[in-house]
Amino acid sequence: MTDSIQSSITPVNIEEELKSSYLDYAMSVIVGRALPDVRDGLKPVHRRVLFSMDREGNTANKKYVKSARVVGDVIGKYHPHGDSAVYDTIVRMAQPFSLRYMLVDGQGNFGSIDGDAPAAMRYTEVRMQKITQALLTDLDKETVNFSPNYDGELMIPDVLPTRIPALLANGSSGIAVGMATNIPPHNLNEVLNGCLAYIDKNEITIDELMQHIPGPDFPTAALINGRKGIEEAYRTGRGKVYVRARATVETNEKGREQIIVSELPYQVNKAKLVEKIAELIREKKIEGISNITDLSNKEGIRIEIDIKRDAVGEVVLNHLYSLTQMQVTFGINMVALDHGQPRLFNLKEIIEAFVLHRREVVTRRSIFELRKARERTHILEGLAVARSNIDEMIAIIRNSKNREEAATSISSRSWTLHSDIINLLDASARPDELEENLGIQGEQYYLSPAQVNAILELRLHRLTGIAFEEVIKEYEELLVKIADLLHILSSAERLMEVIREELEEVKAQFGDDRLTEITAASGDIDLEDLIAQEDVVVTLSHEGYVKYQPLTDYEAQRRGGKGKSATKMKEEDFIEKLLVANTHDTILCFSSRGRLYWLKVYQLPQASRGARGRPIVNILPLQENERITAILPVSAYEEDKFVVMATAGGIVKKIALTEFSRPRSNGIIALNLRDEDELIGVDITDGSNEIMLFSSQGRVVRFAENAVRAMGRLATGVRGIKLALTNDISDDESAVEIEDISDDNAEASLDLNIDKVVSLVVPKGEGAILTATQNGYGKRTQLSEYPTKSRNTKGVISIKVSERNGKVVAATQVEETDQIMLITDAGTLVRTRVSEVSIVGRNTQGVRLIRTADDEHVVSLERVCDADEDDSLEESSSEE
């Protein structure tokens, strides 16, 4: 290798390079390919195709051009990717069954609802639809920003100045890296009515918006069964709607029942549907059908399903809905780019983003038109000067040797201006950039270079033929226009009035009737009713991967067993939170920033032990650098129950459970955290319980719950335990009272690396406390061994912290018949019977609970109630 090559090589860490490069790739896919912009509803490839067709004059009033020509123009100038990707985009924009409002007018074979492929691009021809021009209007009036194309030679718009809320009108779908979008199409009349309602009342609610926009409107029509999923999607940005084929049971001329299918759910392949029904008939999975015939033609869809004499048509139809794509679930996930950042939008936010875009477009257009109008009035003033002094002007031009000399002579002197023009002159018409010494000065007029150039551009016969009346008329019209533009720019009311007028024009020109019928929720499928109730293990990893597995996946082992893998982890990842819940429970997810989010257990991904699950950031709308630090299962929100929260810094807070009974898509503030503190535990109480806080230095404080008053959501809480400031563990169990977090003593700085709260326990009944340490040791100690103290004391020793044990990682209350689960940072999980763990005093080291490798540590402990004492449970040797 030569020295020059060697000197140009820079060593990099391959792991960091892979992370960085993959992140760059992911953002490129998200921003540059897969997600639409919330403002114009288009992905980059759609925007570039339409922009190219507009630049080439391939508009609705021109003749068709070959698709190959458009594709070549797009990939050559704006979109340096494969021609098939661009042609597929053009094809989809020309298919009446794909887009609610087609943007491309195609001539030739563009495929069919049966899944037939379109003809090659050399055979088909295209031009823009009339409605497409509404997306491109005012593009040349500096209404949007432009960016260089891939080679820097041309400029392409970042977004189109659309007058149509295309994201809702045509919807969008796409899969990016780590996120996806699926937005259904809507009726343009209804969406524009919603926009107009928002303009009239910015604080309009989503319920009020739904009076104008009742639901999606698919190009294939069909039926939407029920409104529940629509309402959820419009409120949260995510939801599911059930779309059914339009099918009726009729009696034919032979007196036999037939099911007539005339409309299909959106994106359902008709040929595959017919094939699937025929397959179900052959396999006898559907009874009562004697024949199926597809009689569809260019007039519309018609599938005839003949019913046997002894069958009931409605029953057969219900079977078809449940077993075929005659009923499908359309999962709504309204993710779009908001100025380059991916975001989940609800219905109102999408409309708001579109109206704000229109405000910017109209404002920028008005600024552009104002500048052009002022430039024109300025030129008209110059022409009026020339007309008023025509003889002198002609003499100067004739006596000048060249154009430059004439220009200098004309601009170096003052001129008189006709009194009719002087009376019309208005300061609002003066260009902003015009020098102060130019224009009207007293009764004299000084021409600018632009005016002189305009005069010299005229041929002599045109200069002498200037009609003074026409100049005055045009000047007056421009003054009226300038006044209106200034009014638009200075008045928010006038600006919104212009937006309203333009939206009403679009509605009058392109609005149409709804195609999709929204029916009552009869026969609506409740997803929760379809989910079997079972106990599951929910795990959340340090890297934020969440999943659940059936509890039966884990067999009990003797203590000291090696365990089995609970999940497949990356080298730097490990299970951080583990709990047992029912599939119908709600998981309250508390974040590192003190925010609370809601999830149903069945909404989590179900995965095997070997799978990592799904990143929780793809499920919850977490903010930047926010992570989930505590999770709590809730079956019902009872009025006499409370949620107790504890932080690593020793703060406790009590809040009524009903405060958390109204799930919000973006979460709420549950606890105001201080400094570097974070939430470590939550539990539900009845107001008369006791609270136990266990520290990593092996101490515990137990105090009455009524020592902590119920607080509001925004409160910080009070001090629960006095943590150690050094690694020296003292046996001093004396108490020092600190009444409130605001006391000066409570402000002492704490190092959570030295000591922190690791577990919150709300003891119930008698039982015992099982404590586990980093190195896999632990013990059981009767609850009666732990004395009740005041809150904010040092507490008492719960377990000896030693080199063998390591620090305490968790503690939990257990019963004799329970089992426990221990998880390590290597992803190993062991499940063992509590009865096999010895009961000893507080001030002891305990026994081995799980065998760990030298560099492996226990990170979590979870109790499993009512263990099955089946003798067949897997066993393994134990060792103390």
Swiss-Prot record:
Its EC number is 5.6.2.2. InterPro entries: GyrA (IPR005743), GyrA/parC_rep (IPR006691), Gyrase/topoIV_suA_C (IPR035516), Topo_IIA-like_dom_sf (IPR013760), Topo_IIA_A/C_ab (IPR013758), Topo_IIA_A_a_sf (IPR013757), Topo_IIA_dom_A (IPR002205), Type_II_DNA_Topoisomerases (IPR050220). Keywords: ATP-binding, Cytoplasm, DNA-binding, Isomerase, Nucleotide-binding, Topoisomerase. GO terms for cellular component: chromosome; cytoplasm; DNA topoisomerase type II (double strand cut, ATP-hydrolyzing) complex. Heterotetramer, composed of two GyrA and two GyrB chains. In the heterotetramer, GyrA contains the active site tyrosine that forms a transient covalent intermediate with DNA, while GyrB binds cofactors and catalyzes ATP hydrolysis. A type II topoisomerase that negatively supercoils closed circular double-stranded (ds) DNA in an ATP-dependent manner to modulate DNA topology and maintain chromosomes in an underwound state. Negative supercoiling favors strand separation, and DNA replication, transcription, recombination and repair, all of which involve strand separation. Also able to catalyze the interconversion of other topological isomers of dsDNA rings, including catenanes and knotted rings. Type II topoisomerases break and join 2 DNA strands simultaneously in an ATP-dependent manner. This is DNA gyrase subunit A. The lineage of its organism: Bacteria, Pseudomonadati, Pseudomonadota, Gammaproteobacteria, Pasteurellales.
